[in-house]
């Protein structure tokens, strides 16, 4: 069983990318569980065709830890993908990252990881790998990490910060970085920029996902692109990304760059003056 965490700047399309990749792997015959590690509890919405499932933390609050049952917090979605949302604390109370810890520990207690799974995906909130949201890495659940980014400055800034956190854990023998996924924003020289940025981080751009209105069309219909129309060119892109992740055997400890180096890189590729 391979355990994979997806990180990235808020709004970059991380959850969309993760769910489409999960759907692609499911269509290839793999068995998956997706654990949404975001208090918004929207990391599995497309796989569940818009159905909002009860989160682990909401269920714990409603019935208490002794009465929680696995079938109450694990819902089957597209292609048989098992979907879980960790949820979060009540507004203004508690720590969202702590909620991730509680949710994953609850899943383990309930035996969710004993199923015959090929992949577990963790869709993790956070521009920075803070203690709670780093839990899938720190506690040895996620073994490989992919960062979703674009050629925009703040997306690369966040990716670099995430790499700083990954580096700390990787040096202690925890997870490794599997690569960057460029979710295109049609930035000038975007592919070349992200490839060079990845090289400097001691990793690779595992796939360039082109911008497509079909992603939005599928989302309006509350589906992944694979589910909406598996023959679309964008569906092929997600299948290709899934194939590359499945075949990837190059995992590294990242080498983050300085902010000055990042700004110089942006200037080198004509992104900023």
Swiss-Prot record:
HAMAP family attached to this UniProt entry: NifH
Assembly, per entry: Homodimer.
Name this polypeptide is given: Nitrogenase iron protein
Highest rank taxon of the organism: Bacteria
Gene name per UniProt: nifH
Keyword field contains Transmembrane: no
Cofactor, free-text remark: Binds 1 [4Fe-4S] cluster per dimer.
CDD domains the UniProt entry points to: NifH
EC number, UniProt record: 1.18.6.1
Cofactor: [4Fe-4S] cluster
Taxon lineage: Bacteria, Bacillati, Chloroflexota, Chloroflexia, Chloroflexales
Record: residues binding [4Fe-4S] cluster: 95, 130
Catalytic activity: N2 + 8 reduced [2Fe-2S]-[ferredoxin] + 16 ATP + 16 H2O = H2 + 8 oxidized [2Fe-2S]-[ferredoxin] + 2 NH4(+) + 16 ADP + 16 phosphate + 6 H(+)
Record bears the keyword Transcription regulation: no
Free-text function comment from the UniProt entry: The key enzymatic reactions in nitrogen fixation are catalyzed by the nitrogenase complex, which has 2 components: the iron protein and the molybdenum-iron protein.
Stored InterPro entries: NifH/chlL_CS (IPR030655), NifH/frxC (IPR000392), Nitrogenase_Fe_NifH (IPR005977), P-loop_NTPase (IPR027417)
A single MF term (Gene Ontology): metal ion binding
Residue positions where ADP-ribosylarginine is found in the record: 98
Family the UniProt entry places it in: Belongs to the NifH/BchL/ChlL family.
Species per Swiss-Prot/TrEMBL record: Roseiflexus sp. (strain RS-1)
Chain sites annotated for binding ATP: 8-15
Enzyme class: oxidoreductase
């Amino acid at each position: 069983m391979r355990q994979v965490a997806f990180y990235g700047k808020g709004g970059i399309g991380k959850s969309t990318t993760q769910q489409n990749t999960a759907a692609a792997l499911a269509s290839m015959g793999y068995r998956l569980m997706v654990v949404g590690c975001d208090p918004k509890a929207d990391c599995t919405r497309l796989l569940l065709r818009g159905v909002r499932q009860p989160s682990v933390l909401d269920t714990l609050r409603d019935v208490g830890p002794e009465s929680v049952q696995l079938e109450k917090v694990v819902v089957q979605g597209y292609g048989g993908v098992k979907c879980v949302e960790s949820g979060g604390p009540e507004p203004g109370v508690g720590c969202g990252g702590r909620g991730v810890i509680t949710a994953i520990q609850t899943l383990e207690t309930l035996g969710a990881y004993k199923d015959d799974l090929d992949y577990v995906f963790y869709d993790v909130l956070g521009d920075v790998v803070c203690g709670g949201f780093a839990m899938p890495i720190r506690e040895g659940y996620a073994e490989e990490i992919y960062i979703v980014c674009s050629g925009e400055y703040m997306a690369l800034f966040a990716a670099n910060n995430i790499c700083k956190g990954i580096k700390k854990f990787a040096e202690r023998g925890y997870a490794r970085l599997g690569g960057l996924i460029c979710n295109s924003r049609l930035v000038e020289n975007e592919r070349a920029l992200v490839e060079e940025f990845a090289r400097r981080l001691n990793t690779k751009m595992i796939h360039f996902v082109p911008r497509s209105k079909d992603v939005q069309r599928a989302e309006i219909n509350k589906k992944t692109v694979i589910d909406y129309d598996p023959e679309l060119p964008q569906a092929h892109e997600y299948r290709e990304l899934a194939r590359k992740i499945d075949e990837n055997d190059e995992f590294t400890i990242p080498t983050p760059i300085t902010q000055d180096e990042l700004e110089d890189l942006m200037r080198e590729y004509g992104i900023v003056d």
